[in-house]
C-alpha cells in the first residue's frame, strides 16, 4: 500500500561549506611624514590615529567609561610617555613597566581646539607587551590630573630625545620622554600642538567642516629693526574697522562695536561743522577741550601684541565645529612649521 505522505528530500548532502576570506584595508606606511598631510579618516576605513596610539587609547577609554563618563563627545589625543630626570642622559625615574599617559581633549565638542589636559599613570604587568589600544591584560591606570590648558606650560625640552617639559599651576615640573614604541610622527604632532596652542589656528582651515568667519589672532606690529614701537597717529577711516576686530576678539558684541563706529563718524562730522564755534571760544580765553575727532572709538590697542590665546577660549564659537585633533594636526602640520626648542604656551 502506497503512503499518501510525499517523500521528503534530504538536504544534508547538498550543503557545501564555503570558506569566506575577508579582505581588510591595509594601513599606509606611517614612516614618511608627508603621507600624513591632508589625511582624514573616512567612514568605513580604519582610523590612522588608532594605529599610532594617539586616539582611542587607554586614557580615552578610561575617561569615556561609565565609571568616569568625562567629555563623552570629545576626542582624546593622547600618547604614552616615560617620566625622566633632567640631565645629560635623561635617566628614567620609574621602572620600565611604569608609564604616563598624557592627553588633551575639549570640554565641549564644538570647540575647534582642546582646552583640557589629562594625565594618568599606567602600571603594566611584568613582561606585558605595552600595546596602547587593546592590550591582552588590562593594565592598572590611575587618573592623576585634569587641568585647564591655559594653566599649564608645555615646552619641547629635548627635540632629539623627544622630551617634553610640563609645568603645572602648582609649579610641579615633569620631564616626559615619548615612549620609544611611538614613531617619530607622533612627536611631530605634539610639536604642532604646542605651536597652535601658542599662536592659534590660521584663518585658512584645512577641515571644511570647521566654519571660521574671521581670524582672531592679530598680527604683531613691529618696526623693520625688530623693535615694537607705539606710534600715535591721527585716526583714519580704516581704524574703526581694525578696532572692531579687536573688540570682537575680546568678546564684546558686534552691535556695540558698530555703535562705536557710527558714533565716531558722527563726532568727526560734527567737529568739522563746529570748527568756527571752537575758534570763538579760544579767543574768549576759555580752555579748549580736545576735539572729538582725535579720540578713536577704542583706547590703546598695544595689548594686542601679547594677545596669544586661541579661538577655543571664546564663549560663543562660530557654529558647530567638530573636534578631530588628529585630522586637524595631520592636515596642517609640516616639517617647516615646527617651533624652536623652548617655545611654550
Swiss-Prot record:
It is found in: Golgi apparatus. Residues 222-241, 271-299 are annotated as: Disordered. InterPro entries: GARIL-like_Rab2B-bd (IPR022168). GO terms for biological process: acrosome assembly; acrosome reaction. The keyword NAD does not apply. Residues 275-285 have a biased composition (Basic and acidic residues). Keywords: Golgi apparatus. It holds the Pfam family GARIL_Rab2_bd. GO terms for cellular component: Golgi apparatus. RAB2B effector protein required for accurate acrosome formation and normal male fertility. In complex with RAB2A/RAB2B, seems to suppress excessive vesicle trafficking during acrosome formation. Belongs to the GARIN family. This is Golgi-associated RAB2 interactor protein 1B. It comes from Bos taurus.
